[in-house]
């Protein structure tokens, strides 16, 4: 009996000791640096062998931070020059003539999107606060920007989308971002035409409407939730006031007050492009510029004036209506059950089921159209031309070409290849 009691006591004591050692060990490991410092214990020893070992694995070619920054800005602008996509250019609306007068419309013109969300958002505030704004970028390219309209948009921040931030120097800018859950509120309020000053009706060679949207990791869109300030559509379609401005710009164009209407798409997301060919708006040119970085607006000016020929191609399929995109069905504000019990700092609790698999974008549109034409699969009725506004890989250029077929050579070999000899000539 005594033996059993003694064994039980020993087991209990050992259990307590093991528990203390486990917990104590974890605490000690977590605070090892502080404990070693307090006890004066060093866990490392530097042995100098007398040999010289290079400490820089990648030697810099720049002599200062300023020189490094200038080089990175040059790369940024070169990337924009080669990446911008000319989607529409009726009657050679672009490039604009040297010294052309332009008016910038939409609050987005003064709250341009320079950086994205998620991993790139760490420096968004710094990039945005120090970026070259659109007016300065166009002015540097020789364009004459309507100062009165620009200043009005700058002063009326109640029409800005996103949060208005004032930096230490008193400069205001906007940050457009969501929160750590799907369905973040995105606003496309902008200013209606009736609120604009008389400067909006100034004579100009071109009216440039800026459409900015921003989202991504940590700032997901919920397509089934209308954006604040919109009576129809969603955040990736034009808002009511943006459409109102376009309608009135067409009126000014018909009256001869402005020469042409240009739309800049300032977004990395797939905007609905139903507006581009809508006769109610009279849009002459559409230029996709993406998210431009700190100095990308300089490149926009050079493309608009023809100093640089746009040669980019779309990396996505753009739809007239995003409801025709199969991923639309899986977008929304889906949350894990009981996710609200998590601390706010860890409430990334949204999820999406990618039930469309790889069949999104061009993989979906091209496959379904092929099946429809060939009468195979389960394609149903499908009108490609009424669904896709701009396909994957699309992009125009200011350059025009004439081609001539010089001959055809057929080779009888294992790959049964055919060679076409074609002469291409630049005509402008």
Question: Where on the chain are the PLM-derived regions?
Answer:
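C-terminal non-catalytic regions of proteins with extracellular/luminal or membrane-system context
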Residues: 1-428
């Amino acid at each position: 009996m005594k033996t059993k009691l003694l064994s039980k006591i020993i087991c209990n004591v050992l259990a307590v000791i093991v528990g203390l050692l486990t917990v104590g060990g974890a605490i000690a490991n977590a605070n090892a640096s502080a404990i070693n410092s307090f006890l004066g214990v060093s866990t490392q020893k530097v042995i100098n062998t007398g040999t010289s070992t290079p400490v820089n694995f990648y030697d810099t070619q720049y002599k200062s931070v300023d020189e490094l920054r200038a080089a990175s800005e040059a790369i940024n602008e070169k990337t924009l020059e080669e990446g911008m996509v000319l989607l529409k250019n009726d009657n050679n609306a672009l490039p604009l003539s040297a010294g052309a007068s332009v008016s910038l419309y939409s609050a987005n013109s003064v709250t341009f999107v320079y950086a994205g969300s998620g991993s790139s958002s760490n420096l968004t505030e710094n990039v945005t606060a120090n970026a070259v704004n659109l007016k300065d970028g166009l002015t540097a390219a020789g364009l004459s920007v309507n100062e009165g309209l620009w200043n009005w948009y700058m002063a009326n921040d109640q029409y800005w989308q996103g949060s208005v931030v004032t930096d230490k120097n008193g400069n205001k800018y906007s940050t457009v971002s969501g929160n750590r859950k799907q369905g973040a509120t995105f606003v496309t309020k902008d200013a209606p035409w009736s609120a604009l000053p008389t400067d909006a009706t100034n004579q100009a060679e071109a009216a440039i409407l800026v459409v900015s949207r921003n989202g991504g990791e940590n700032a997901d869109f919920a397509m089934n939730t209308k954006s604040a300030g919109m009576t129809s559509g969603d955040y990736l379609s034009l808002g009511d006031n943006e459409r109102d401005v376009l309608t009135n710009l067409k009126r000014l164009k018909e009256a001869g007050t402005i020469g042409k209407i240009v739309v800049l798409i300032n977004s990395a997301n797939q905007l609905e492009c139903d507006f581009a060919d809508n006769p109610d708006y009279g849009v002459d040119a559409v230029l996709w510029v993406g998210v431009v970085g700190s100095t990308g607006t300089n490149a926009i000016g050079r493309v608009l004036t023809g100093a640089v020929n746009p040669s980019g191609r779309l990396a996505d399929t753009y739809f007239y209506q995003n409801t025709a995109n199969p991923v639309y069905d899986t977008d929304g504000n889906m949350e894990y059950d009981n996710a609200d019990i998590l601390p706010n700092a860890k409430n990334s609790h949204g999820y999406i089921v990618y039930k469309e698999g790889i069949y999104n974008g061009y993989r979906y549109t091209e496959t379904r159209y092929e099946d429809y034409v060939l009468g195979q699969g389960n394609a149903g009725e499908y009108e490609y031309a009424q669904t896709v506004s701009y396909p994957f890989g699309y992009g125009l250029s200011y350059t025009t070409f004439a081609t001539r077929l010089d001959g055809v050579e057929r080779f009888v070999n294992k790959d049964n290849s055919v060679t076409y000899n074609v002469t291409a000539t630049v005509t402008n």
